Amino acid sequence: MKKILFSMFYSILVGEEPDSVFLKKEGKQNQVKMIWVAPSSCAKDLTISEGTGATFLFNFHSRVSICFHALF
């Protein structure tokens, strides 16, 4: 898996399968939450451009939307 950091609190792990994307949040007191992002659990738009990065849009059932661009 490839780890991509996109802020001081969030990072993602991208696997070989298109749906094996993990969203990791490191909270206060070293608490770490890992969420497996699957098409059945959220609406996901993933665009990968080789050599430049990827743009991700996550819309979780908790009404939290995250959009970011990560360079590889």
Swiss-Prot record:
Keyword vocabulary terms for this entry: Chloroplast, Plastid
Primary localisation category: plastid
Keyword Plastid: yes
Subcellular location: Plastid, Chloroplast
GO CC terms: chloroplast; plastid
Family: Belongs to the ycf76 family.
Protein name: Uncharacterized protein ycf76
Organism name: Oryza nivara (Indian wild rice)
Gene designation per UniProt: ycf76-A
